[in-house]
Structure formats: C-alpha cells, structure tokens
Amino acid sequence: MEQIAARVTYINLSPDELIQHAVKNGEGVLSSTGALAVTTGKRTGRSPKDRFIVKDEQTADQVAWGNINQPVEQRTFDQLWERALRYLSERAVYISHLQVGADDNYFLPLKVVTEFAWHNLFACDLFIRPSGDHANGKPSWVILSAPGLKTDPERDGVNSDGAVMINLSQRRVLLVGMPYAGEMKKAMFSVLNYLLPPHDVLPMHCAANAGQSGDVALFFGLSGTGKTTLSADPHRFLIGDDEHGWSATSVFNFEGGCYAKCIDLSQEREPMIWNAIRHGAIMENVVLDENGVPDYADARLTQNSRAAYPREHIPLRVENNRGRPPDAVLFLTCDLDGVLPPVALLTKEQAAYYFLSGYTALVGSTEVGSVKGVTSTFSTCFGAPFFPRPPTVYAELLMKRIEATGCQVYLVNTGWTGGAYGEGGERFSIPTTRAIVNAVLSGKLKEGPTEVLSGFNLTIPKSALGVDDHLLNPRKTWEDVSAYDARAQRLIQKFRENFEKFKVPAAIREAGPSDVH
C-alpha cells in the first residue's frame, strides 16, 4: 500500500468531520439545505483533453488509443506522481479507505488521498464505504488528488495546467490541478471499464432500479438525457444512477452514491433528488443567495451544477446495491431533430447498432469548453469518454447478455418531437416519458399492437397507457410530413456516416436505418 507522507494526515474521518474541516478550511459553506456548497473555479466539468492513460506493455494492444484515450509514457507519469507527493507532503491530507463495485467478486479496494476535505467527502458519498476489512487480500488502487498543484505543459508533457492520469498497471490514478470532483468518479469508472470485460462483465454507463418483485431495469444515456431523473422513480427501488456492471448472474452498482445535475431542479418534478440534497451532500457550483438558499435556475457558474449524495439519502433503494439480470433495457436518446419516436422495441442486432452509435445530444454538457446550448452527438456505448477498450468489445458483451437473458431493449427518445430543436419542435415532457417508462416496465408495451417506422425500420407501439397515441409515431406529430421525411433522411445519413468506422457483422450493420420511403 502506498505510503503518503504529509504535514498532517486525517484518516477515515466521518462525513460530519470532513464537512467541519471543509468549512474551517474555507473550502465551502453550509447552505440552507444543510448540504456543503462548493465552487470549482474555471473547471466546472470534465476536462477530456487533459485525460491520459499510461501506455505500457500491458495496455499497448488493449486500449483504443486516440483523442479520448490519450497515451502518456510511464516516465512522465512517475515524474508527476512524485511531484504531487512532494506537494502533498507539505500539507494536511485526507485519506479514506473505500471500494468501487458492490459485487464480492469484482470490487476494487480504493485508497483516496486528497488535498481538499470536500473531495474526500465526495469520495465517501460517491464510492462505497466498506463494512469492516473487506479487501479479501485484493491489492488496493490509489487516487491521489492535488487540485492546488498546477502542471506545466512543457515540463510535464500535458496540455494545460491540469491533468488526469490513469496508470492501469500500477493501480494508480493521479489528478493534478483538477478541482472538479467528478473527475475522480469518472477515472475509476474508466478503470472498471477496462478491467471487467475480460472477466465476462459488461460495464455500463447506465442507471438501474428494481420493482417490488425484484425486476430490474437499466437506463443507458449521456448526461442530461434522463438517467438520474427517470431512475429516481417513486414506485421503484434505486440501485444506482450512473455506473453498473452486468455479470452472468447480476447487475451491480459500481458506486455508493449519486451525482445529480441540479440545473432547474424542482421539488415538484424531482422530489427524490430535491430531498436528497441535505446534510452530508455536496452542492457543486450551485449559486446561493445571501441567505444560503440555492437557486437551481441560476446558471451563472455553469449549466453543469451538481449534487453529490450517498445512496442512503434515497429512501427507496435496494439495500445490497445490486439486483438480478435486467428484465428491460432502455437506451435514452435525446433527439434534437425531432424525428425519432418516443419509444421503439429493438431486436438484439438493433440494440448493438444503437449501442455502438450512441446517438443523443449534449444537454448542458459536462465537459469544460463545450459550446453553450445543445448539440447532437454520437457517443459510443452512450459514454465514449469512459471506455478504454475498442467499442466492439462492449457491444459483443451486450449482445451476449441479451441472448442469455432474453431481455427486451427499448430506444426511448427524451428529446424533441413535432419539429426540430429551435425550429418549432417541443421536448417530450417528463410526465410523458415517465408514462412510457411505466408502460415499458409493466411489460404491456411489448404485448400490444405495433407498426414499423419507415426509414429507421423501428418497431413502435400503436398505444401506450398514459400517452397520447398521436405522439407515438413522430411522422404524425409534424404538420409538414415532407419536412419530417427530409429531416429524417438527413439524420439517417449521419447514422450511416458515423457507423462506417465500425467493423461488425453484416446483421448488425443492416439493423440500422435505410432510406425513407
């Protein structure tokens, strides 16, 4: 285990103690909700251009290197790691012994070493606090977080004044100049996404919940498409809101908490999230008024304001943080063109096609430097920034799991209909999407009459309880059908161009869209 020398070392403090330290250190203030409110300066989201993976003998042929998985040499990593250790040796540091992964076979022990008390609280909220000594002889991973230390691109071989470096061979994650806490959780997500496929576990960027009878649903999607909102269901039990593994026998959470977007949060629309933001939680870049009351509609600091809280703040939760293999899988896509249906039933080949495509929108992007507003994107596996291996590795595992369980996969559009974004279209309301999700989870949607949507070749229901029938076929929601056809053809062409890069069996390629008739 890595030995950390520091001026003062605080080990395994309670959340209350970490909050006291954070306030005393001037890292944040207590809000009217009781949650700790912090700001992160210019870095209010992930910094994908500053994320690196050490390229060595073990990883050279296993990682899909490129703009997302940028290589860095072992020597460069070692030098920066040593610099971070020297920097922290002159300061008080906070250390917590945690774990990622709620499955006894696949969890990783994790030692989190942070300069900021609130970063350690974040780790305690988001990762899993083990009961007793649960390491089972497994070697521990180490996160080293030094946000006050800045990098020099010329000296340190990086791109800016901050860097995230993942060393898969040495079980180390280094964060320098990175005050945005989400970098810690996404770094460990990337680690699990690399480690688990060889163990026949599909890692997923998805939320998961369970019904009264134990039936499990998965919600895949990029940030802002509805994973956290739709999985926080008042009639179901939450497993997790963001990162899970699907083994031959179960679905299990990687985390022990939630990291919810706060922009425009309302008690009426999202009561479970609203009520979870209390003492023990963290509000990141949420604007407070002079009385410490959060204004969730104020995007002055960022569109990507966040709340981190432990699962224990959600009353309806699955206690052991895992469930059986899923009965329903939902791909949440936010279609800006307004041409996709609110729900479609996918074959396993279509599931692989849309999983690899990952078509959606960047809604209030989580990335630093992103264009304000909304733009469409193709994000492989509904989470391209977090998957180190080639995308087909994950797609093949997904198809294997679908075949083994027979679970139904659905494409659910949480975006626009009746026209494109900014061109007369309207976004599906949360109540409409919830009604669709309820129809999916009841099992009734797949039993009713269906039709095929031309061009996309998607099987869509003719009726769904609680949803206006005319909304189910997007072609019928446009006043000008020829305008719909033209817009649909444009999106179909984008799908085809994006898919050219994948080497897949013909059955998967042919499951994609064809020309509009």
Swiss-Prot record:
It catalyses: oxaloacetate + ATP = phosphoenolpyruvate + ADP + CO2. InterPro entries: PEP_carboxykinase_ATP (IPR001272), PEP_carboxykinase_C (IPR013035), PEP_carboxykinase_N (IPR008210), PEPCK_ATP_CS (IPR015994). It comes from the Bacteria. GO terms for biological process: gluconeogenesis. Pfam families: PEPCK_ATP. ATP binds at residues 186, 205, 221-229, 270, 306, 433. Binds 1 Mn(2+) ion per subunit. Substrate binds at residues 46, 180, 186, 306. The keyword Lyase applies. Mn(2+) binds at residues 186, 205, 242. It is an enzyme of class 4 (lyase). Its EC number is 4.1.1.49. One of its GO terms (molecular function) is metal ion binding. Its cofactor is Mn(2+). Belongs to the phosphoenolpyruvate carboxykinase (ATP) family. This is Phosphoenolpyruvate carboxykinase (ATP). It comes from Coxiella burnetii (strain Dugway 5J108-111).
